[in-house]
Amino acid sequence: APSDELRPEARVGKWLQDAHGWWYRNPDGTFPANKAVVIDGATYRFDEQGYMRIGWVPEGDTWFYHDASGAQVSGWVQDGGSWYYLMPGSGAMAIGWVKDGESWYFMRPSGMMMTGWVNDGSAWYYLSPGSGAMVKGWVQVGSSWYYMNPDTGAMMVGWVKDGSAWYYLRPGSGAMATGWLMDGGSWYYLSTDSGAM
């Protein structure tokens, strides 16, 4: 008669738990340690003692997030009141610009999603305080209006034509000017209601 060790049901991996946490016994009886392993389609990471990791896990210069079940997460994760984006497929924490659907987001070097004004070294952008999504077109911040490039989202300055009207966005701040404006030796009047010339 075949031994129990050779029967198919005896050759399946198994999750085990003790007072320190969860670990996984491979079908051959070994335990994964200090590595990532795909189990039933989900990625898990194990520490040097073989225990399953949860929360933020570094691997080289890259961070990954594992939920309470230990499975690696991708997409948006809220942790400690901040939002993070984990790349679909790899699960790596994103930094810098990230496109999700039709919207762009900016992640700090710590991975936290930014909101409000951000300068990425090339231009100023405004990220919606509620969603973090890059704003394009007109946006009111405080009592001032700004115009963000409808294609790139970069803050525009100087003269801008929107529809049939011209607007002036102050260099330096980008705020829309109203009332009388002197530019290049000429005076212009910009509506105090709409800013249109």
Question: What do the PLM-derived regions correspond to, one by one?
Answer:
Residues 1-197:
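Extracellular adhesion/carbohydrate-binding repeat motifs centered on closely spaced tryptophans
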